[in-house]
From Swiss-Prot:
PROSITE patterns according to UniProt: RIBOSOMAL_S10
Signal sequence residues: none
Superkingdom per UniProt: Bacteria
Organism: Citrifermentans bemidjiense (strain ATCC BAA-1014 / DSM 16622 / JCM 12645 / Bem)
GO cellular component assignments: ribonucleoprotein complex; ribosome
An example molecular function term from Gene Ontology annotations: tRNA binding
Protein name, per record: Small ribosomal subunit protein uS10
Keyword Ribonucleoprotein in record: yes
Length: 102
C-alpha cells in the first residue's frame, strides 16, 4: 500500500480508558513497522443539561449535569499489510468508539 494513510479517530467518555486504547493502537502500529503521528488530543465536547429538581413549582431550584466526550486522533503513515491485519484483530474496550478512514 504505497503512500497511503490510515486515520483513526477515537471517542470516549472516560479519558483513562481512551488513553489506554490509544496506547494499544500505537504499540501495535509501531510493532508492525508503520510510522505513527499522534495521538493528537482533539477538543473535548461538553454537553450540559439543566433539570428542575422538583416536580412542581420551584423554578429556581435546578440541577445541572454534564457529559464530557474526549477525542483523540491517530495517523498511521505508510501502513503495511501486517499493520492492517493487526489493527483488525485488535480488541479494544467497550466504552471506546473507533472511526477508521483509509
Amino acid at each position: 500500500m504505497p503512500s497511503q494513510k490510515i486515520r483513526i479517530r477515537l471517542k470516549a467518555y472516560d479519558h483513562k480508558l481512551l488513553d489506554t486504547s490509544v496506547g494499544e493502537i500505537v504499540d501495535t502500529a509501531k510493532r508492525t513497522g508503520a510510522r505513527v503521528a499522534g495521538p493528537i488530543p482533539l477538543p473535548t465536547v461538553i454537553n450540559k443539561y439543566c433539570v428542575l429538581r422538583g416536580p412542581h413549582v420551584d423554578k429556581k431550584s435546578r440541577e445541572q449535569f454534564e457529559i464530557r466526550t474526549h477525542k483523540r486522533l491517530i495517523d498511521i503513515l505508510e501502513p503495511t499489510q501486517q499493520t492492517v491485519d493487526a489493527l483488525m484483530k485488535l480488541d479494544l474496550s467497550a466504552g471506546v468508539d473507533v472511526e477508521i478512514k483509509l
